[in-house]
Amino acid sequence: MTGIIHSLLDTDLYKFTMLQVVLHQFPQTHSLYEFRCRNVSTVYPLADIREDLEAELDALCRLRFTHDELGYLRSLRFIKSDFVDYLELFQLQRRFVEVGTDDKGRLNIRIEGPMIQAMFFEIFILAIVNELYFRRLETPAVIEEGERRLQAKAARLKEIAAAQNPDEPPFLISDFGTRRRYKLAWQEHVIRTLLEAAPSIVRGTSNVYLAKKLGITPIGTMAHEFLQAFQALDVRLRNFQKAALESWVHEYRGDLGVALTDVVGMDAFLRDFDLYFAKLFDGLRHDSGDPYVWGDKAYAHYQKLKIDSRTKMLTFSDGLDIERSWALHQYFKGRFKTGFGIGTNLTNDMGHTPLNIVLKLVECNGQSVAKLSDSPGKTMTNNSTFLAYLRQVFGIPEPRTP
């Protein structure tokens, strides 16, 4: 039986861009990732898929990159040849993943091992969990409803494409939905349908396998885990964001220039994002908190630094759909170029409640790391003492409880 994942390219581009930095700059780093389902309830306990998940992980760890896949990666100008040589030898190791359940029917997944291994498991495991869960709920009516919703999105994108003013910055969306997709075949169907409806709007996908197959642009730069790792590397905690951004610049020399802002919140990020970084990076990515407030803060920051914000890109990727994206574009288009990464709403809008699942970095080199998100529900760590210390170091107040 072919596994759910049948290509190691079937993941997000930023896994490759981050892994390349890890391999070149801190290959000895050890890390721990933990799974969490944020849903209050599910149709049936996730523990029920444990046996199938174990089998899928076994199949995943038998995969290797093909010469064709390696050739594609080599064609991306920011991927270095020695990294591709490393990937030719690469194989995920099953021993680094532990799967368990608890008495409440919850699924427990831990990935612990070298970061150059552990980091690469995340998207695969989330996509597998999603597909196993929704496979049991699939009926012809579910597919019919998914198709109806997809056709409505395609029609709306056609309307927007017709309404766009060619003299204004373009409205551009990308598929960011690999981790929470219904299944790979559906993700591909969604991208093909929207591309056909509005080729001027659909910019690409974060999924490298589908970007290669469909001949579109793979999209992505960095994730929270990259910046979080620097909380445990050889730098003062107060300087971890600067060290991470400096490391990125050293690796990519101006390529992949979109920085993620919400590891310790936008205000703390902007205190570190000085003139040097603001000139070097092409723009910023929003992934939590109020996107309008966030974008206005970004605009004020560029103004203060006397940088023309119209030369910069704001990328939004937090819980978006087409209407929210279009509204944000209308609000910011006079001040910024914009881009929108839409995830679950594209790849798993079938009428069911989607799974809100994550696999997050919680330790690096035996030391806790944390994300102090602009959305309190997205804060994640396994160490409340470290979280309090992080708040103190960056002057971030405790969130008010309602």
UniProtKB/Swiss-Prot annotation:
Swiss-Prot/TrEMBL GO biological process terms: NAD biosynthetic process via the salvage pathway
InterPro entries: N/Namide_PRibTrfase, NAPRTase_N, Nic_PRibTrfase, Nic_PRibTrfase-Fam, Nicotinate_pribotase-like_C
Residues with Phosphohistidine modification: 224
Gene Ontology annotations for the cellular component aspect, listed alphabetically: cytosol
EC number of this enzyme: 6.3.4.21
Molecular functions (GO terms): nicotinate phosphoribosyltransferase activity
Catalytic activity, reaction form: nicotinate + 5-phospho-alpha-D-ribose 1-diphosphate + ATP + H2O = nicotinate beta-D-ribonucleotide + ADP + phosphate + diphosphate
Disulfide bonds: none
Keywords: Ligase, Phosphoprotein, Pyridine nucleotide biosynthesis
Post-translational modification: Transiently phosphorylated on a His residue during the reaction cycle. Phosphorylation strongly increases the affinity for substrates and increases the rate of nicotinate D-ribonucleotide production. Dephosphorylation regenerates the low-affinity form of the enzyme, leading to product release.
Pathway(s) where this gene product acts: Cofactor biosynthesis; NAD(+) biosynthesis; nicotinate D-ribonucleotide from nicotinate: step 1/1
Top class in the EC scheme: ligase
PANTHER family with a match to the protein in the record: NICOTINATE PHOSPHORIBOSYLTRANSFERASE (PTHR11098:SF1)
Function: Catalyzes the synthesis of beta-nicotinate D-ribonucleotide from nicotinate and 5-phospho-D-ribose 1-phosphate at the expense of ATP.
NCBIfam families: NAPRTase (TIGR01514), PRK05321.1 (NF003704)
Family: Belongs to the NAPRTase family.
Record's protein name: Nicotinate phosphoribosyltransferase
Chain's gene name: pncB
